[in-house]
Amino acid sequence: MKRNFDSVKRLVIKIGTSSLVLPSGKINLEKIDQLAFVISSLHNKGIEVVLVSSGAMGFGLNVLDLETRPAEVGKQQAVSSVGQVAMMSLYSQVFSHYQTKVSQLLLTRDVVEYPESLANAINAFESLFELGVVPIVNENDAVSVDEMDHATKFGDNDRLSAIVAKVVGADLLIMLSDIDGLFDKNPNVYEDATLRSYVPEITEEILASAGAAGSKFGTGGMMSKIKSAQMVFENQSQMILMNGENPRDILRVLEGAKIGTLFKQED
């Protein structure tokens, strides 16, 4: 299937913790700089971009020099609150190198479930777009207890990114991960696993091919990405799942390169 994203004017990019934090726990500064360059390039072309960024926990562990994620919810919240400040400080600094202004929006599930607060959120996004600002979104981990327990809030930022895409009426959601896309079976187990370039619907076979593992710093796994794709389908939009190793590949994707997996319903 030929890919054409010429009509994309509003884009949501989601980046996971594993793309921002190295296995050693150090921050991947090169990756963040590349991401800022790409988003700034798109911004300069007139494309409105929202960045949904995980990483508060990973940044917090780095700042506090902790090797493992705390077990207690209160400490998880504390570490995330420290990390969120560090992450946004770095984003602001790096984006400024490309003369791009950014803002922080921390959401909780109740914000998008109640009409009044949802309207306020939409107004905030639209105002930021009008001001030429790139919104950087994360869940408010310090008060969203269920995010810490992987339960019933947004659950993880995969789902949050799909919700944000709906809220802002995005033409495309690009989900950056530590995998190349959706395979027909687990590529870490089966050497003959094949990358699916195009997924027009979420079938039982697709669900069965999704695993459940996330990284040690994050909460998301393949199943959460598939569920996000389902939400995108419900919103009559489209999603790309691709490896975040080289953020500059986003530019190639938007030019039509067949990178990652495209989730798009048949016309």
From Swiss-Prot:
Protein name per UniProt: Glutamate 5-kinase
Query: A Pfam family name for this chain?
Result: AA_kinase
Annotated catalysed reactions: L-glutamate + ATP = L-glutamyl 5-phosphate + ADP
Q: Per its database record, what is this protein's job?
A: Catalyzes the transfer of a phosphate group to glutamate to form L-glutamate 5-phosphate.
- Binding sites annotated in the UniProt record for ATP: 14, 177-178, 219-225
Binding residues for substrate: 54, 141, 157
The record lists the lineage as: Bacteria, Bacillati, Bacillota, Bacilli, Lactobacillales
Q: Which UniProt keywords apply?
A: Amino-acid biosynthesis, ATP-binding, Cytoplasm, Kinase, Nucleotide-binding, Proline biosynthesis, Transferase
Q: Which InterPro entries match?
A: AceGlu_kinase-like_sf, Asp/Glu/Uridylate_kinase, G5K_ProB, Glu/AcGlu_kinase, Glu_5kinase, Glu_5kinase/COase_Synthase, Glutamate_5-kinase_CS
Alphabetical GO biological process terms: L-proline biosynthetic process
Record GO terms (molecular function): ATP binding; glutamate 5-kinase activity
Query: HAMAP family from the xrefs?
Result: ProB
Q: Which PROSITE patterns match?
A: GLUTAMATE_5_KINASE (PS00902)
| Protein's organism | Streptococcus thermophilus (strain ATCC BAA-491 / LMD-9)
Keyword Kinase appears in the UniProt entry: yes
User: One GO CC annotation, please?
Assistant: cytosol
The entry sums up its family as follows: Belongs to the glutamate 5-kinase family.
Q: In which pathway does it act?
A: Amino-acid biosynthesis; L-proline biosynthesis; L-glutamate 5-semialdehyde from L-glutamate: step 1/2
Q: What is its main location?
A: cytoplasm
Q: What is its EC number?
A: 2.7.2.11
Sequence intervals crossing the membrane: none
